[in-house]
A protein has these predicted regions:
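PRPP-associated nucleotide enzymes
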Residues: 3, 13-142, 147-244
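Cationic, amphipathic, low-complexity alpha-helical segments enriched
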Residues: 1-9
Length: 244
């Protein structure tokens, strides 16, 4: 039966989180990308946490970010793809650093691609940046976080209109694990159901909460009992239904 599980509850399957995922969670905190407190989201919800991928700004941060994406893509989708596509704007650097990391880690020679918000009518005219898409291309899409699926709704028709391609999957850095526009499913699950391709995240908020509760990062406890209670209350109200 479907049930709502409090964020950070033990994994019912008893799985152990991979080391790189634990490192990624702390990396987000250290980079001031993932913050805890009280934040008003675009949706109007008051959230006890906020993620801003725009805070990755240094060479080291971007290099490490690409490594984490590449490892997660390898684990979730394998290496049977040709292009890493990142929707404008935040997806542009994500696609670049992930493509570079794929080559560094696995010797994988993928191409990067992104879209422009407005088509260019001079020079390298068109709607795409980076590599053009070709018939038969297998594409992995990368985003920072999917809260409503709106960016996929905008970009999926663009890339599928350029050539006869296959989307192998969508990878995001964080699965917020809260209901999307449909009202019961997580946004990532809604994207998968609507478009028919796999979706995955480097980590989800259940893993984040379990790892950070009571743990010090940079000398301070990131999720204390008060923040944990706020997270549990938030997911009791907005948490997506998961299979037990």
């Amino acid at each position: 039966m479907p049930s709502r599980r409090a964020c950070g509850a033990p994994d019912p399957k008893g799985r152990t989180m991979e080391q790189y995922k634990q490192e990624f969670i702390e990396f987000m905190v250290e980079s001031d990308v993932l913050k805890f407190g009280e934040f008003t989201l675009k949706s109007g919800r008051t959230s006890p946490f906020f993620m801003n991928a725009g805070a990755y700004v240094t060479g080291d941060q971007l290099h490490r970010l690409g490594i984490y994406y590449a490892r997660a893509i390898h684990d979730a989708f394998g290496l049977d793809f040709d292009v890493v596509f990142g929707p404008a704007y935040k997806g542009i650097p994500l696609s670049v650093v992930t493509t570079m990391a794929m080559h560094e880690l696995y010797g994988k020679e993928a191409r990067y691609c992104s879209n422009r918000k407005e088509a260019k009518d001079h020079g390298d005219a068109g709607i795409l940046l980076g590599s053009p898409l070709k018939n038969g291309d297998r594409v992995v899409m990368v985003e920072d976080v999917t809260t409503s699926g709106k960016s996929i709704e905008e970009t999926y028709p663009i890339i599928t209109s350029q050539a006869d391609i296959e989307v192998k999957g969508l990878m995001v850095s964080l699965n917020r694990m809260e209901v999307g526009r449909g009202g019961t499913m997580a946004a990532l699950d809604e994207v998968r159901e609507r478009y028919g391709f796999p979706t995955a995240a480097i980590v989800d908020m259940e893993e984040v909460t379990a790892h950070l509760h009571g743990r010090k990062v940079r000398g301070r406890v990131v999720i204390d009992d008060g923040i944990k209670a706020a997270l549990d209350a938030y997911y009791e109200r907005y948490g997506a239904v998961k299979e037990a």
